[in-house]
Amino acid sequence: MEKNGNNRKLRVCVATCNRADYSKLAPIMFGIKTEPEFFELDVVVLGSHLIDDYGNTYRMIEQDDFDINTRLHTIVRGEDEAAMVESVGLALVKLPDVLNRLKPDIMIVHGDRFDALALATSAALMNIRILHIEGGEVSGTIDDSIRHAITKLAHYHVCCTRSAEQHLISMCEDHDRILLAGCPSYDKLLSAKNKDYMSIIRMWLGDDVKSKDYIVALQHPVTTDIKHSIKMFELTLDALISFNKRTLVLFPNIDAGSKEMVRVMRKKGIEHHPNFRAVKHVPFDQFIQLVAHAGCMIGNSSCGVREVGAFGTPVINLGTRQIGRETGENVLHVRDADTQDKILQALHLQFGKQYPCSKIYGDGNAVPRILKFLKSIDLQEPLQKKFCFPPVKENISQDIDHILETLSALAVDLGGTNLRVAIVSMKGEIVKKYTQFNPKTYEERINLILQMCVEAAAEAVKLNCRILGVGISTGGRVNPREGIVLHSTKLIQEWNSVDLRTPLSDTLHLPVWVDNDGNCAALAERKFGQGKGLENFVTLITGTGIGGGIIHQHELIHGSSFCAAELGHLVVSLDGPDCSCGSHGCIEAYASGMALQREAKKLHDEDLLLVEGMSVPKDEAVGALHLIQAAKLGNAKAQSILRTAGTALGLGVVNILHTMNPSLVILSGVLASHYIHIVKDVIRQQALSSVQDVDVVVSDLVDPALLGAASMVLDYTTRRIY
């Protein structure tokens, strides 16, 4: 597991700025502390942790038994825009000495605060690796700009949701350095015990308060519109006073505008009002219980849209500060909280409800994933970041490497019978190809793949080909993000839950991509074939089985569980023959090579296959090609079987046309030319008139699986990795 390039421990510096980010960083810190054989932990505390007005929250870090290596007073008081800028500058002045003394291998920073921006800037300029927690999220304020700026400085990213992961990818961050882990606070939140919650409620809200009969209010200034956010806070307090329920009010973050918000609280007498409890800080484990058993939470804190959903507690989200975040159904947005009546109406609608619990932001297992991710960091890798930019128009200028070497990929095709490895050039030329029988066991197969790839890589040097990576096409269902074969076809034994990426990458020291053969056929058409330049098309590959791939808006569709484009298992008959998938009536049960072989054997056993001009040697197995030969020589029964097979395939294509409405359907594989005319006839007879003009063509690619495997590598390099 260790990849840090030497035998010493990884020195990790965790820097925390305020009570909110500590709730996310503390679970990671506890996790690091439990593995002293792998990690050394340094803790740096700065920002509002060290300010009395905000509760001196550094004390809770000490209470958690963490040694604080450094305390940095970095907040310039004033709570306005200029003070925030000066605070960043003060942190930038102080941090270099600290980082020079600690010499961390990696610094962990969280979120979107201006303090975190100072930390990331310092570490980046001092060539210290940065792990950013909760990047890629969208809220809707200046926080977005700060968060995304930290993302560009950070070398590694831990995100909480699939959407955040996609945002990071769209920001051109290196895919291999992004971890979808979930929110670390959920590890503690989802395991919280409820038995003492009443004592916590009484401690903070009074002895007479019952569960679900109080409100938690947490509102911060919006630094891009301070005047409006202060007015909204004033209206919120008026609505809460009118609603007449016991309310716990937490002081706002130390942002521009926070001082004015505190003045509003004091002007309205909130600190002395019998229905209010105003506090600077609540420990996170107690805060969890308070929001879990509240009748409602109101304000604009990220906690309301992130953590509170795990309990189904009603939330009223005021204004635009969190408007871009993913939320559960427990959140009621009041974007224009411009009247007391509107906020009061929201309180009446939400208070006391119980919503389904949602776990959008985590499953309680983030910390183990993060620790594993940390252990995998290779300190010998170049520090310079790589960005994956989208495809651009090819540069007409020349590169000396392109002249002296042929940029190429190693392509691997795992078929039911053969295992093939090829060197494929950027132009789609197969420079060299190796073929072996596919072994029956996992161990033999993986060893043969490694052996063939090593041999091909050595040959590539002699052929002046620079190998950029390895692409693998295999039958079955594949998780291309992880490079894992989830479930294989029955033709490839011992090939379920197989990690292909790791052994090849470790052996060849090259990036590795994996996908199934149907998807690879579509990728081959997109880069080298008749799908080049098309926005939408579908490929059907006919061979031993039936597969396919769907290109939509120039991108390959994988589906939520990587099961998209299993086109061979479209059902075209309710009472058709059994299929290898366990169902019946699938296209594959009619039109695949296996299906034709089955029918050929039946005819042969009944002495109805052979016609004049045909013979089958005794040592040769009867197969699909014999059936096709018999049909060509006039065997009516063989012709009928092929017609039925082509009709089944044609009905599948009709269903695809009605579902996807692609601009082109490409039939690929050894049987495509035998089916094309029947498929077109079925479309004319069965399809809606509006899709009958869609082109259906036979692929002109000789090795679509190999070319598609290569295209995964070659497409990636054209994204201009820097």
From Swiss-Prot:
Changing L486P: In THC12; uncertain significance. Changing V572L: In NM and THC12; likely pathogenic; mildly decreased UDP-N-acetylglucosamine 2-epimerase activity; decreased N-acylmannosamine kinase activity corresponding to less than 10% of wild-type activity; does not affect homohexamers formation. The keyword Membrane does not apply. UDP binds at R19, S23, R113, H220, N253, V282, S301, S302, E307, R321. Changing I200F: In NM; uncertain significance. Pathway: Amino-sugar metabolism; N-acetylneuraminate biosynthesis. In the N-terminal section; belongs to the UDP-N-acetylglucosamine 2-epimerase family. In the C-terminal section; belongs to the ROK (NagC/XylR) family. One of its GO terms (cellular component) is cytosol. It comes from the Eukaryota. Highest expression in liver and placenta. Also found in heart, brain, lung, kidney, skeletal muscle and pancreas. Isoform 1 is expressed in heart, brain, kidney, liver, placenta, lung, spleen, pancreas, skeletal muscle and colon. Isoform 2 is expressed mainly in placenta, but also in brain, kidney, liver, lung, pancreas and colon. Isoform 3 is expressed at low level in kidney, liver, placenta and colon. An N-acyl-D-mannosamine 6-phosphate binds at G416, G476, R477, T489, N516, D517, G545, H569, E588. It is found in: Cytoplasm, Cytosol. Changing R177C: In NM; decreased UDP-N-acetylglucosamine 2-epimerase activity; impaired homohexamers formation. Zn(2+) binds at H569, C579, C581, C586. ADP binds at T417, N418, R420. Residues 406-722 are annotated as: N-acetylmannosamine kinase. It catalyses: UDP-N-acetyl-alpha-D-glucosamine + H2O = aldehydo-N-acetyl-D-mannosamine + UDP + H(+); an N-acyl-D-mannosamine + ATP = an N-acyl-D-mannosamine 6-phosphate + ADP + H(+). Bifunctional enzyme that possesses both UDP-N-acetylglucosamine 2-epimerase and N-acetylmannosamine kinase activities, and serves as the initiator of the biosynthetic pathway leading to the production of N-acetylneuraminic acid (NeuAc), a critical precursor in the synthesis of sialic acids. By catalyzing this pivotal and rate-limiting step in sialic acid biosynthesis, this enzyme assumes a pivotal role in governing the regulation of cell surface sialylation, playing a role in embryonic angiogenesis. This is Bifunctional UDP-N-acetylglucosamine 2-epimerase/N-acetylmannosamine kinase. Changing H132Q: In NM; decreased UDP-N-acetylglucosamine 2-epimerase activity; impaired homohexamers formation. Its EC number is 3.2.1.183, 2.7.1.60.
